[in-house]
A protein has these predicted regions:
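Active-site helix/loop module of the DD-peptidase/beta-lactamase fold
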Residues: 60, 65-69, 83-125, 143-144, ...
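Active-site Gly/Thr loop motif
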Residues: 212-284, 314-374
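Active-site SXXK
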Residues: 16-20, 39, 63-90, 166-171, ...
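Structured C-terminal helix/loop/strand segments within mature extracytoplasmic catalytic/sensor domains
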Residues: 361-407
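Short, conserved catalytic-motif segment at the N-terminal edge
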Residues: 5-66, 88, 144
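Active-site-proximal alpha-helical segments within enzyme catalytic domains
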Residues: 116, 162-169, 274, 278-300, ...
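Short, gly/Ser/Thr-rich active-site loops of penicillin-recognizing serine hydrolases
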Residues: 296-299, 308, 313-328, 388-407
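Flexible glycine/proline-enriched surface loops and loop-helix/loop-strand junctions
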Residues: 59, 145-152, 162-165, 267-276
Length: 407
């Protein structure tokens, strides 16, 4: 069994037991988990291997790629500007970014960028990986792109374009890149080990990502498991998996925008560039601390005020259909994607988070950052063994343990 180090305060042993069980059961290779309550860490654990090939242990300061968990940090940057009166979510994007108004987008409001309702999950203009790393070519492609649907009438996860859309608005307002703004306004004031655009000197601290073996004998087994989790008829689940997650779907194409592949995701070029939807490197302590600062003071620093949090966590997608899903299946998609202004909201049983009022963002591979305003909790989980399932049980089990400890 892997060694687990760190802090566990009295009353929080259930979280520690759940974390240790992930190693015992082979669910984790290396990982970290942290819980803040009222601005103070009550659980701060790490263990296992940061790199199996070299037998390097996961240390307190180890960081890892957290994929789409990055989107929560990017959303916080936007809401910090809203809080300062510098960004109006109901204003057209073109007010801040005039070139965006082409192809019928002149009235598209900023809020649709944050809620994945803009109709821009993909671009028609081919953009190479090298061009995406340079930023401007993908921004130009978004300016020239016509929305796939009338903005605000449908939604679909903007897997990669989200970061360029929100990041360019922030750049136009502040004159700083998203990664620089995040570093100066969030990471440094809170003392986080978190970067969107990884400095080369941090490379020795980065955990090596491994893909977990596919746990199913066939796609039919995956569908059966998904149906059981969601309470769906297997036929319904099979159609959803095919239409939403199948090869050639817009959802799958959205994840490949900018020439992103499994190979170049682990390159120095990708780590050094800014992909504000997908390439933050951080650890669980920093995720929990960052989210804690949205619901409480952390060492005298409060990132977002209660009225800002209340406004940014209103669900935006409940009244719109998921793009590409047949109408007969729409009732089944409501709990697949409940998005507020940049954050997932709790969607039991697939993503219960910390409770009904909680918000956060998961990432491919299993990472999660979340907060709960009612219990004033910040939560972070970061693994380096990336699960190959539609729903990762590790964060679900850890957040369930947090809820139990809260009573």
């Amino acid at each position: 069994m892997s060694n687990v180090d760190g802090l566990v305060e009295d009353g929080w042993e259930r979280v520690a037991d759940t974390f240790r069980a992930n190693f015992k059961d082979g669910k984790d290779l290396g990982a970290a988990c942290c819980v803040y309550v009222d601005g103070r860490a009550v659980v701060d654990l790490w263990g296992g291997l940061a790199d199996r090939e070299t037998n390097r242990p996961w240390e307190r300061d180890t960081v890892a790629l957290v994929a789409s968990t990055t989107k929560g940090a990017t959303a916080m940057c936007a809401h910090l500007l809203v809080q300062r009166g510098l960004l109006d979510l109901d204003a057209p994007v073109a007010r801040y970014w005039p070139e965006f108004g082409a192809e019928g987008k002149e009235k598209l409001p900023v809020r649709y960028l944050l809620s994945h309702q803009a109709g821009l999950p993909v671009v028609d203009t081919p953009v190479t990986f090298e061009e995406a790393c340079a930023w401007d070519p993908l921004v130009r492609a978004l300016e020239a792109q016509k929305p796939l649907w009338t903005p605000g009438t449908e939604h679909l996860y903007h897997a990669m374009t989200y970061g360029f859309l929100v990041g360019e608005v922030i750049r136009r307002i502040t004159g700083r890149s998203l990664g620089t703004f995040f570093a100066e306004e969030i990471a440094r004031p809170l003392g986080l080990s978190a970067w969107i655009g990884l400095p080369e000197e941090i490379e020795p601290r980065v955990a090596r990502i491994e893909a977990a073996p596919f746990p199913y004998k066939s796609m039919e087994d995956l569908v059966t498991d998904f149906a059981k989790l969601m309470g769906f008829d297997p036929a319904v689940a099979g159609t959803l998996v095919k239409d939403v997650y199948g090869p050639g779907s817009t959802f799958m194409k959205a994840g490949a925008v900018g020439g992103i592949t499994e190979e170049n995701m682990h390159s120095r070029a990708y780590r050094a560039a800014e992909f504000p939807a997908a390439n933050m490197f951080t650890n669980a302590h920093s995720l929990a601390r960052m989210y804690a600062a949205t619901v409480s003071d952390v060492d005298g620093f409060r990132l977002l005020q209660p009225d800002t949090v209340a406004a940014m966590t209103v669900v935006q997608t409940d009244r719109t259909r998921m793009h590409g899903v047949p109408p007969v299946l729409l009732p089944y998609t409501k709990n697949l994607f409940r998005m507020s202004l940049g954050f997932w909201r709790a969607t039991p049983p697939i993503n219960p988070l910390l409770g009904p009022a909680s918000f956060g963002h998961p990432g491919s591979g299993g990472s999660l950052g979340a907060a709960d305003p009612e219990s004033r909790v910040g939560f972070g989980y970061v693994p380096n063994l990336w699960a190959a399932t539609l729903v990762d049980p590790r964060a679900i089990e850890l957040t369930a343990a947090v809820r139990k400890c809260l009573g």
